[in-house]
């Protein structure tokens, strides 16, 4: 297995806006971006939280942001593969965020086994007995299929902090040609990424609902949360500017082949209301407001 390069941080404030985490360390609030994440003493001045794909970090409680980095900078100038917000009290992943562009496609697929992040989490911050979810698949939030350009990046997607329990009928296939609604959403996102020009990028934040009892199906053995809903916040940057949309679906134990992706597509603003998460907070406020309030299905082929 490839050696992992990991970093962890725990808090966030507000600040400057950068695509790749090279923003200011001053901690000053950009007047054009009042809700952005800001590197500070509390989070070790970690610049990764200023990347475009990041949402606003949750305040209160005990959270850790785990930034999974590659040794190579061939695919990302800062070596970032994907990042996770981990709730240490709930012992659950809140979201995974990452970038997609043409450079992430290659020949490597499912090169690793599942493993725990014992480097960044202490024994009381995760349930180590749940290496397998009885009755559920281990659902990658950053999929293995989105990281096929190198063995190292693919192997990192198998860390258990990047997993949520998902029904096989929601995130799998069968021999009769059925495919889960969630996996169809992921496949569509991958198709959009495959059509990007060499200078275009898709920014993604995905996860399941863990913050409200009404949005939880159950707890495995009374412990591990099974989210009732799953979502994707999607931001595309191209020569035409920014476009945004989101997917939202309840998790059920049925194939739902008659349901279209369009019926689960919403604006990012609506997704924020449903999740309580401020997505793409590192965009300038005027750009963020425009792309989040509008969902134009005509610019998203395949819906």
Please report, for each region that a protein language model flagged, where it lies by residue.
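Domain-level detector for secreted/extracellular nuclease and nuclease-toxin modules, and
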Residues: 14-303
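C-terminal motif of bacterial Sec signal peptides marking the signal peptidase cleavage site
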Residues: 9-13
């Amino acid at each position: 297995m490839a050696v992992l390069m990991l970093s962890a941080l725990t808090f966030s404030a507000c600040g400057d806006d950068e695509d790749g985490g090279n923003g200011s360390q001053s901690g000053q609030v950009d007047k054009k971006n009042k809700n952005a994440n800001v590197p500070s003493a509390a989070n070790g001045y970690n610049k990764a939280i200023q990347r475009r794909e990041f949402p606003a970090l949750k305040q209160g409680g005990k959270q850790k942001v785990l930034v999974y980095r590659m040794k190579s900078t061939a695919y990302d100038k800062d070596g970032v593969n994907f990042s996770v917000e981990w709730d240490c009290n709930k012992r659950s992943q809140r979201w995974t965020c990452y970038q997609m562009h043409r450079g992430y496609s290659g020949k490597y697929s499912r090169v690793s086994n599942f493993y725990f992040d014992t480097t960044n989490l202490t024994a009381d911050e995760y349930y180590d007995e749940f290496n397998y979810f009885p009755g559920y698949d281990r659902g990658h939030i950053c999929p293995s299929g989105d990281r096929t350009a190198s063995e190292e990046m693919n192997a990192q997607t198998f860390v258990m902090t990047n997993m949520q329990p998902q029904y096989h009928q929601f995130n799998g296939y069968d021999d009769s040609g059925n495919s889960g609604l969630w996996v169809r959403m992921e496949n569509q996102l991958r198709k959009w990424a495959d059509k990007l020009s060499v200078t275009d990028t898709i920014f993604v934040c995905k996860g399941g609902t863990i913050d409200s009892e009404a949005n939880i199906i159950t707890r495995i053995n009374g412990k591990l949360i099974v989210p009732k809903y799953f979502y994707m916040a999607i931001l595309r940057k191209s020569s035409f500017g920014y476009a945004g949309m989101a997917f939202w679906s309840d998790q059920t134990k049925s194939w739902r082949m008659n349901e279209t992706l369009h019926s689960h597509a919403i604006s990012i603003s609506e997704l924020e209301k449903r999740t309580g998460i401020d997505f793409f907070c590192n965009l300038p406020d005027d750009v963020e407001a425009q792309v989040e309030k509008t969902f134009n299905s005509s610019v998203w082929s395949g819906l």
